Amino acid sequence: MKELLYMELAEVYHRLESTTKRLEKTEILAELLRSVDKELLPDVTILMLGRVFPIWSEEELGVGIKLLMKAISLVVGVSMDEIEDEIREQGDIGLASEKLFSRKTQTTFFSQPLTVEFVYSRLKALASASGDRAQSKKINILVEVLSQAKPLEARYITRTVLEELRVGVAEGIIRDAIARAFEVDPALVERAHMLTNDLGMVAAVAREEGEPGLGRLNLEPGRPVKPMLAQLASSIESAITELGRAFCETKYDGIRVQIHRCGDEVSIFTRRLENITAAVPEILEGVEEALPADDYIVEGEIIVTMDGRPASFQYILQRVRRKYDVDRLTREVPLSLFLFDVLYHRGPLIDEPLWHRREVLESILSEIPGRVEASRMVDVGPDNLDDALWLFKESIREGHEGIMIKDTEAPYIPGIRGKKMLKFKAEPETLDLIVVGGTYGRGKRAHLVGSYLLAVRDEKSGELKTIAHVATGLDDQTLQDLSERMENLKVERRGRKIRVKPEIILEVAYSEIVRSPEYESGYSLRFPVVKRIRDDLSPDDIDTLGRVISLFKQGFS
């Protein structure tokens, strides 16, 4: 296998970071992908996203900024305070590391140039470090890598460890680069990525097997895909008129899950592709009883019901977050599952129309009332519009969010928000935004982050762009919890201002979207209010600048 020096990769990162032009980034990446040895291609592709594992992998590096700073301190020979000062000065741990490493006087004897294979294997080893001495093991691994790093390499190694590469490359740019590098249809690359959620695999297949190989990639139980997403309907009547015929379903206020059976193993994934099987034993037991022993992928919503009504979304988060005391929580906060789609049963079904997929779901599901059921659904057309209106009113009366309105002829399109699936809610539309910073309070509230700086994702560049500050909608306990999380994610603090690794997602309601030069997005939200914390979403799931602009133009705001 032809070696690839990590410095060569770092220089590519630097070129990507130095341009804002999408086409230029695409060509830089295509050039790299063409030149990389086939054995390294999947790893390099994932590294270009600033990740070490595919998004659906259960493996995590488990390294926070404090642990990383400790390793830098040992390698460079400076204090933690000096590192914090440099991060504050540079505004980024990568740039701070580069500056500190450029002043390093110690040299590792007999050090060899870092290779991508070595760096990648040692970063993966971080996820395997466990037990009583896990933190020490992780520090030793980081020191082993960083002690051989040159300043530019240190910039990108440290950013990769925190999964915050900051070179303006998103999945769309990498898909385009794969298509250009190996001269294959971009639509085939996009579809292959939607069905595998593994750009490393897609790149390898595109190179070795071309378009025929990409066409053969398909759904596989055990490997989750991003869910099909819904647009907001302005009214039930207009949605039914546009679709002609639709399945209308109760919109449950819970956590959307994808359940996979592969052989004897059943896995339950959230919308952010996180495996929560161990946290929801009653759901696992229920689906094993209610569904056949065939391989399948089904989709549904997990909710909590208390006193006959849906309970707060936060109760569900409490369940799926906990790794301990699961038996007690299972008794105190019991869960129910409502299934509404099947993506795979004895073969992929996503290209089949919804009406057929629903028939398959109902044929394989043996409902267990109160535990595992099919979603409540009515078949609606222009002639029986009243049935949809009845379902909406009934769903709201029972404490649910509203209804889903789905085109009966639509295939399942993973990861796409389109007009084949619509939602109509009693409450105004909201945005899912990511926290990038905040401001601490004063006086008795000086220990709490009282105002949160929010951002959307620019889908063209992949960058986060600020759009609002929000300071209302959170009770004191939630503020305390969020402030502790912010401190753990801290990248920089200056006075009362804090900047954090973008990880916390808030669902925010607002009265209006307006143009504003104050924020990087060019837009702002009037009277924003936090509706809930969205720990069921990943940073890739947040709303985009394109959606904000669309809402602004349509006047939904």
UniProtKB/Swiss-Prot annotation:
The active site is at K251. Its EC number is 6.5.1.1. NCBIfam families: dnl1. The gene is lig. GO terms for biological process: cell division; DNA biosynthetic process; DNA recombination; DNA repair; lagging strand elongation. It comes from the Archaea. It is an enzyme of class 6 (ligase). Pfam families: DNA_ligase_A_C, DNA_ligase_A_M, DNA_ligase_A_N. ATP binds at E249, R256, R271, E301, F340, R417, K423. Its cofactor is Mg(2+). SUPFAM superfamilies: ATP-dependent DNA ligase DNA-binding domain, DNA ligase/mRNA capping enzyme, catalytic domain, Nucleic acid-binding proteins. The lineage of its organism: Archaea, Methanobacteriati, Methanobacteriota, Methanomada group, Methanobacteria. InterPro entries: ATP-dep_DNA_ligase, DNA_ligae_ATP-dep_bac/arc, DNA_ligase_ATP-dep, DNA_ligase_ATP-dep_C, DNA_ligase_ATP-dep_cent, DNA_ligase_ATP-dep_CS, DNA_ligase_ATP-dep_N, DNA_ligase_N_sf. It catalyses: ATP + (deoxyribonucleotide)n-3'-hydroxyl + 5'-phospho-(deoxyribonucleotide)m = (deoxyribonucleotide)n+m + AMP + diphosphate. Belongs to the ATP-dependent DNA ligase family. Keywords: ATP-binding, Cell cycle, Cell division, DNA damage, DNA recombination, DNA repair, DNA replication, Ligase, Magnesium, Metal-binding, Nucleotide-binding. This is DNA ligase. DNA ligase that seals nicks in double-stranded DNA during DNA replication, DNA recombination and DNA repair.
